Amino acid sequence: MAFLKKSLFLVLFLGLVSLSVCEEEKRESEEEKNEQEEDDRDERSEEKRLLGMIPLAISAISALSKLG
């Protein structure tokens, strides 16, 4: 009977350890995913900002060409 208790305790302990490791890996992968999404969002906002400046640049160039 004592052997069964020890075996059961060992199985439960190893199960908890593996569950803890899996949860930690899952948490890390979610953090990496969130960081990746934030980086993508930042890149898109920079692209939009630059695209918004194109009409201004075109109008400035045309104004300069009219002067010269």
UniProtKB/Swiss-Prot annotation:
The modification Leucine amide is found at residue 67. The primary structure of this peptide is identical to that of Phylloseptin-L1 (AC P0DQK9) and of medusin-AS (AC L0P329). Expressed by the skin glands. Keywords: Amidation, Amphibian defense peptide, Antibiotic, Antimicrobial, Cleavage on pair of basic residues, Fungicide, Immunity, Innate immunity, Secreted, Signal. Residues 23-49 form a propeptide. It is found in: Secreted. This is Medusin-AS. One of its GO terms (biological process) is defense response to bacterium. Residues 31-41 have a biased composition (Acidic residues).
